[in-house]
């Protein structure tokens, strides 16, 4: 499996297929029992999570991760203060830019516990981008978000391509996910059943039989159509003898389960 910078790739599949496990292996939350993970031709399989983050692998967990008793601006700034890549002036400038980009100015003084589902997600994504990652993994980004806010989150995710960020997304809301991704890997019982564009998967009879259902209809979201763009570089995952990860000309990998 591989993911390029500047594209959005879905990890799809039924419960127990291996989606979250793959995420955990990429981020370093668990150690794979087979296969290797590479980033920019560097084997990062044995690196701890914080080292992977320093090298450009961001992660947004399925569970709410906003600091509940800190304000929005404190949530974002706290992450940047742990990084030595920005000066104080650069941190302040970047902080204001993120608040503006994610439309968080009105709630900047609000504590995490006071935010709506959509505001919380925007804050979490802004915080994940604070240290300028090459790749970001989004685990269930639409969970706990009301339908009206889903399109806002879709647009934010779709725009990440313009920043040359590689996005890996998994969500049980398959319709909303396929509506914004460039391509996907469909995991089934720990293996890759099929891969391709949303159109390829929607037209595949085996995919419809085992996962999408016979009545599924693919509909691209307005967010995707507005934000459609491209970019270089890759992240990927493979079997033990050929695992790989992203780079301008290289890629990260996660082993099969």
Give short role names for the model-derived ranges.
Residues 89-107, 154-158:
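Conserved ABC ATPase "signature" region
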């Amino acid at each position: 499996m591989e993911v390029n910078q500047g594209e959005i790739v879905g990890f799809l599949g039924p419960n127990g297929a291996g989606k979250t496990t793959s995420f955990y292996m990429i981020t370093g939350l668990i150690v794979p029992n087979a296969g290797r993970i590479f980033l920019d031709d560097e084997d990062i399989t044995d690196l701890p999570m914080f080292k992977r983050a320093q090298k450009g692998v961001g992660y947004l967990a399925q569970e709410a991760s906003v600091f509940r008793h800190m304000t929005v601006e404190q949530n974002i700034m706290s992450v940047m203060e742990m990084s030595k890549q920005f000066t104080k002036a650069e941190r302040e400038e970047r902080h204001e830019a993120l608040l503006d980009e994610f439309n968080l100015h009105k709630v900047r003084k609000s504590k995490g516990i006071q935010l709506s589902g959509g505001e919380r997600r925007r804050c979490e994504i802004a915080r994940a981008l604070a240290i300028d990652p090459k790749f970001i993994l989004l685990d269930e980004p639409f969970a706990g978000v009301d339908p009206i806010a889903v399109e806002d989150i879709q647009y934010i995710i779709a725009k990440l391509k313009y920043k040359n960020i590689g996005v890996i997304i998994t969500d049980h809301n398959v319709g909303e996910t396929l509506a914004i991704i460039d391509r996907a890997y469909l995991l089934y019982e720990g293996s890759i059943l099929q891969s391709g564009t949303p159109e390829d998967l929607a037209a595949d009879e085996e995919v419809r039989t085992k996962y999408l259902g016979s009545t599924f209809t693919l509909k691209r979201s307005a967010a995707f159509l507005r934000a459609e763009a491209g970019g270089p570089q890759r992240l990927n995952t493979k079997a033990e003898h050929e695992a790989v990860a992203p780079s301008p000309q290289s890629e990260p990998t996660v082993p099969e389960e």
